[in-house]
Amino acid sequence: MAQFVRNLVEKTPALVNAAVTYSKPRLATFWYYAKVELVPPTPAEIPRAIQSLKKIVNSAQTGSFKQLTVKEAVLNGLVATEVLMWFYVGEIIGKRGIIGYDV
């Protein structure tokens, strides 16, 4: 057991160095996209979002959503799934747990 611990302690700096070297470029890429994608909407984007929601409601009322191509329908489904998943992530963060609320 002591031999195992000694080997682990000797190899730890090399493993940590390799992990840092491996993750630095990926972390830089993550931060680049996080700064671009995770910003709140600007005031100029809010009217466009409202117009888009009105367009969705109108297509649901008139039935024009039936004329979508398969690609458009799949993309709309993926966007809806992404919005739903971010809602669930916010719920998990707010609850500070995956299951139930602490009351």
Curated annotation (Swiss-Prot):
One of its GO terms (cellular component) is proton-transporting ATP synthase complex. Keywords: Acetylation, ATP synthesis, CF(0), Hydrogen ion transport, Ion transport, Membrane, Mitochondrion, Mitochondrion inner membrane, Transport. The modification N6-acetyllysine is found at residues 11, 24, 35, 54. Its main location: mitochondrion. It comes from the Eukaryota. It is found in: Mitochondrion; Mitochondrion inner membrane. Pfam families: ATP-synt_G. The modification N-acetylalanine is found at residue 2. The keyword Ion transport applies. GO terms for molecular function: proton transmembrane transporter activity. The keyword Cytoplasm does not apply. GO terms for biological process: proton motive force-driven ATP synthesis; proton motive force-driven mitochondrial ATP synthesis. Component of the ATP synthase complex composed at least of ATP5F1A/subunit alpha, ATP5F1B/subunit beta, ATP5MC1/subunit c (homooctomer), MT-ATP6/subunit a, MT-ATP8/subunit 8, ATP5ME/subunit e, ATP5MF/subunit f, ATP5MG/subunit g, ATP5MK/subunit k, ATP5MJ/subunit j, ATP5F1C/subunit gamma, ATP5F1D/subunit delta, ATP5F1E/subunit epsilon, ATP5PF/subunit F6, ATP5PB/subunit b, ATP5PD/subunit d, ATP5PO/subunit OSCP. Subunit g, of the mitochondrial membrane ATP synthase complex (F(1)F(0) ATP synthase or Complex V) that produces ATP from ADP in the presence of a proton gradient across the membrane which is generated by electron transport complexes of the respiratory chain. ATP synthase complex consist of a soluble F(1) head domain - the catalytic core - and a membrane F(1) domain - the membrane proton channel. These two domains are linked by a central stalk rotating inside the F(1) region and a stationary peripheral stalk. Belongs to the ATPase g subunit family. This is ATP synthase F(0) complex subunit g, mitochondrial. The lineage of its organism: Eukaryota, Metazoa, Chordata, Craniata, Vertebrata.
